[in-house]
């Protein structure tokens, strides 16, 4: 038998998989005094939604396998090849190419920002809800060769298809 209402609420929240909701007392303390029930419920649901979104973002970022985090705000656009405009890079960062089922291949000399841009676009894609898998070209080539030799190319293909974007920097 459960003793208190608080314990019952926490148990039900656990069963319903609403972990943030279980911290209702903290959320209620922060709410406006005299708020009606629908306002309180809305605050609880918004807190639960925000926590879930944050957890999903954290999982996507971890699964992407970025070696480090970089943003376009940190990028020195003077490194770019003169034929590539900063506006074009910002357009890529909108991630519209993913919805359009287009690929991006970045080729160039070392130190020109290909990896930085790939990671920055990948981070943006993760935060927009896309699954991303980051592989540099050398690692991807090695994995494909090893999978081919082990007759497991299908496994690699499924892994790549599962993700909305493959950034090879």
For every predicted segment, state its role.
Residues 1-8:
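Intrinsically disordered, low-complexity and often Lys/Arg-enriched segments
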Residues 14-69:
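Interdomain "pre-motor" coupling segment immediately N-terminal to P-loop NTPase/helicase cores
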Residues 24-28, 74, 103:
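Short hinge/gating elements
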Residues 27-31, 78, 147:
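Alpha-helix C-capping/helix-to-loop hinge sites
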Residues 75-91:
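N-terminal pre-P-loop "Q-motif" helix
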Residues 86-163:
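Conserved P-loop
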Residues 165-169:
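Conserved AAA+/SF3 P-loop NTPase catalytic/coupling segment centered on the Walker-B
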């Amino acid at each position: 038998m459960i003793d208190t209402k608080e314990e019952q609420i926490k148990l039900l929240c656990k069963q319903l998989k609403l972990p943030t909701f279980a911290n209702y007392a903290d959320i209620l303390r922060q709410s406006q005094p005299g708020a009606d029930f629908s306002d309180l419920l809305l605050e609880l649901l918004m807190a639960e939604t925000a926590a879930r979104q944050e957890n999903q973002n954290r999982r996507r970022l971890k699964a992407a396998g970025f070696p480090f985090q970089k943003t376009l705000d940190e990028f020195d656009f003077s490194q770019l090849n003169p034929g590539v405009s900063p506006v074009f890079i910002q357009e890529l960062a909108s991630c519209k190419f993913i919805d359009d089922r287009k690929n991006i291949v970045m080729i160039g000399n070392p130190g020109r920002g290909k990896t930085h841009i790939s990671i920055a676009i990948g981070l943006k894609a993760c935060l927009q809800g896309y699954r991303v898998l980051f592989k540099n070209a050398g690692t991807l080539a090695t994995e494909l060769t090893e999978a081919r030799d082990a007759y497991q190319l299908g496994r690699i293909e499924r892994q790549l298809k599962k993700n909305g974007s493959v950034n090879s920097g």
